[in-house]
């Protein structure tokens, strides 16, 4: 199994660094993406590198529905989006990512395959932890 299944990407870390230095504006996270390229031939999640610039087999990108801060310290933000009934029917989802308003993948994770039934929505949360 992969040691590291989720990561803030290199471009995401670069943007954070430059924003903290006051040299750049940090665009908001606005989209969640799902794909089926997050597992190896044995169905195990592949390790993430941080160098990902997109999902390996991206299937769908949607707007973030909401975000919430986890805990009192507000150092984790949970982003939520839903695969509705009728979306990605029959697909096996194994990777997801967060895109910012400039279209850059800033967070990526892999996981075991999740089958998508036609008549059942699936709600996905992805945490950005600082």
Show which residues each predicted segment covers.
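Small cysteine-rich, disulfide-bonded extracellular modules of the LU/uPAR three-finger superfamily
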Residues: 1-93, 101-130
């Amino acid at each position: 199994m992969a040691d590291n299944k989720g990561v803030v990407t290199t471009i995401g870390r670069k943007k954070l660094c430059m924003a903290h230095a006051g040299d750049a504006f940090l665009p908001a996270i606005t989209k969640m993406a799902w794909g089926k390229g997050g597992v190896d031939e044995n169905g195990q999640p592949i390790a993430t590198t941080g160098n990902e610039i997109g999902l390996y087999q991206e299937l769908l990108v949607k707007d973030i529905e909401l975000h919430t801060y986890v805990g009192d310290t507000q150092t984790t933000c949970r982003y939520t989006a839903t695969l509705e009934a009728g979306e990605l029917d029959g697909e096996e989802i194994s990777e997801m990512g967060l895109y910012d308003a400039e279209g850059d993948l800033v967070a990526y994770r892999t996981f075991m395959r999740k089958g998508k039934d036609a008549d059942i929505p699936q709600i996905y949360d992805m945490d950005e932890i600082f």
